[in-house]
Amino acid sequence: HSLSRRQRQMCIRDSTRLPYDPNLSKKLLAEAGYPDGFEITLDCPNNRYINDEAICVAAVGMFAKVGIKVNLDAQPKSIHFKDLQNGLSDFYMLGWGVPTFDSHYVYSFLLKSDGSWNKVGFKSDRVDELVGTMLTETNLEQRNANIAEAWAIVQDNMPYLPLHHQVISWATKSNVDVPIRTNNEPV
């Protein structure tokens, strides 16, 4: 699941998608000391998201284009998420839905220094401070400014690599009524 500001309450500035540029990627890898790329394992669930393993297979091919050899380890979600929570993965697929449609939900779990799902180790004292204001600031204009500042810091640091936004479509016949919650699950 992408960390897209477009879907959240606080859409302040447009999100800029990074360009697809394999040559720039190779150049940056060389500058970082990896002129010949490197090898890493991508941990991926194979029964949690729609086409999760297929998405990871596609990512493996994309990384290969810039010289990064990715070994795919696709496992059932019961193993995958347990390994993530125990800090046993350095590179992994993680989806994140936001049933509240508010930035605080994303930040408190994924981007706050002590967030329970901040497994990438992202740390920013300023972001932590801004996350605190998301709970207490009652002036909506100021709250949105704080959120925009936090998103700018995160975008500049890129602790996560957003791949896609999973959209689930539901359809029924006119004689069937199935209420759907914001987390895409039927009631």
Q: What is each model feature region?
A:
Residues 1, 30, 82:
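Short, flexible, glycine/charge-rich loop motifs used to bind or transfer phosphoryl groups or to couple energy/partner
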Residues 33-35, 64-70:
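Secondary-structure transition/capping motifs at alpha-helix termini
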Residues 1, 7-15:
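Conserved small/polar residues in nucleotide/adenosyl-binding loops
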Residues 22-41:
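Immediate post-signal peptide segment of exported/extracytoplasmic ligand-binding proteins
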